[in-house]
Amino acid sequence: QEIIRHVSDGLVMAEKNGLPQVLKDFIVTHHGTTCTGYFYNRYINDGGDPDDVADFYYDGVKPTSKEQVILMICDAVEAASRSLKDYSEASISSLVDRIIDGKAEDGQLSDSDISLRELNTMKEEIKLYLQQMYHSRVVYPKRKGRASK
């Protein structure tokens, strides 16, 4: 799948361009060993064999540093937030909680030393950021008549 291949393609590009190992490590850990949920669910809903799911998992490496965890979570939240229909505080909060809790429950964070306190801080900061990013703006009316100088 093209979506899964972007990790290995990114690594090839990084090597071709002589990027340092630390950046290559970020490339291979930003999805860890997660499942491509959207495509997996569509496959299952279309009658696919639940035992034939290897193609829906990234073959990367789980993050080992806090910084890699931050990238993994921010990448997932950013992508998922684009599909929101409702940008209310509750909707954003639910999305962020679901993604971070899901990564933890899936064991994606188990090789890092990130603490629960740090994860909770991340949750709050990401929620605040998304609320600010998606907040409604007042539509300013245009002036009728002559334009002012």
Labelled PLM ranges:
Residues E2-K149:
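Terminal helices and disordered tails flanking the catalytic cores of nucleotide-processing hydrolases
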